[in-house]
Amino acid sequence: MKWSVIQALALASGVQAHGYLTFPMSRTGLNAQAGPDTCPECTILEPVTAWPDLDSAQVGRSGPCGYNARVSVDYNQPGPRWGSAPVVTYKGGDVADVQWCVDNNGDHGGMFTYRICQDQALVDKLLTPGYLPSEAEKQAAENCFRAGTLPCTDVNGQSCGYSPDCSPGQACWRNDWFTCKGFQDTKCRGVDNAPLNSCYTSIAGGYTVSSRIKIPNYVSNHTLLSFKWNSFQTPQIYLTCADIKITAPDSQSPPTTTTTSTPASPPPTSCATPAASVAVTFRSKTTTSVGQTVKIAGSIAQLGGWDASKAPALSASQYTSSNPLWTTTISLPAGATFEYKFIRVESSGAVTYESGANRVYTVPRDCAGTATVDTAWK
């Protein structure tokens, strides 16, 4: 009875759970970056049984990649701004960082998971331009994604607890899924404890929710990573997908022999020891007024960990009215992947973040030791 009352009150008040996959960037997020999806966090499957049974709901038209009724977009097929190519490449066996964004006005706790379907024929139905899968095909794909859950417990050293809002014996009492903090505690935002607007949502600003997953030893030139979040408070489920590529794991080193040979020189495009850190120059064309400055804030310590007071400032030494360029060079660890935004700081200390979804950058692993990122304020 108590559960029914909670559901009824939540729906009556118009409050809805809101969130979407942001790293790797989902189809939903890409369409939001381009502009047409004005509420990426509104891709909701509702009303359905979301708790305590996490997998009993049929996905219907939402499919494993989501349908946003607010903007009438079905993400189970490629669109003009998403789905034509992978946004990231993994190797089988990789441990990868993943992240989603929960809206400040729609954090209803619960549990979430990441899945990969290894039936390429089913996935191809979600990759074919101009083809909209039927609801039966969407459900078949969803069943495959459920079978391909990437357990939290597959990543060594990762904390994989049980939901504080679930009890032993309930279907939600499992730790292969990831859990938010308790609904009476800090909910999903408590996973990272990131500041407000650490990721983009259109309603009330978002908080990042980060985890790590282990990529299966499976090879596909184009497949999908499906994210699913089951709300504790409301009868709602979130489903979004990112287009990814998975290559074969690195081959094992051949067994050693007694043969003596002279080490080969590195090929011209490589080197014996790639740089451990890279001096990355960020160049942002940002029009400012007298007294304003520009900083770069992001999800890693070198960018202040989303703390604007600790974010490094850019220099206006090359700024002109025709070329409003702000620059800075920061030493970053090779291979690091992070989210970031430029922020405009008033002389009063007030801060304005760029609009839209967070930018994402991966520091190159090579011998140059330098890299440049050219952007413009958005």
From Swiss-Prot:
Enzyme Commission code: 1.14.99.55
Modified residues (Methylhistidine): H18
Keywords attached to this entry: Carbohydrate metabolism, Copper, Disulfide bond, Glycoprotein, Metal-binding, Methylation, Oxidoreductase, Polysaccharide degradation, Secreted, Signal
Biotech use, per record: Starch-active PMOs provide an expanded perspective on studies of starch metabolism and may have potential in the food and starch-based biofuel industries.
GO BP term (any one): polysaccharide catabolic process
Alphabetical list of SMART domains matching this protein: CBM_2 (SM01065)
Processing and modification events after translation: O-mannosylated.
Record region (Disordered): 250-272
Cofactor note: Binds 1 copper ion per subunit.
Domain CBM20, residue spans: 272-378
Xref: Pfam families: CBM_20
Signal peptide interval: 1-17
Reaction equation(s) it catalyzes: starch + reduced acceptor + O2 = D-glucono-1,5-lactone-terminated malto-oligosaccharides + short-chain malto-oligosaccharides + acceptor + H2O
PANTHER family the UniProt entry points to: STARCH-BINDING DOMAIN-CONTAINING PROTEIN 1
Function: Starch-active lytic polysaccharide monooxygenase that oxidizes the C1 position of starch substrates. Catalysis by LPMOs requires the reduction of the active-site copper from Cu(II) to Cu(I) by a reducing agent and H(2)O(2) or O(2) as a cosubstrate.
Protein name: AA13 family lytic polysaccharide monooxygenase A
Gene: LPMO13A
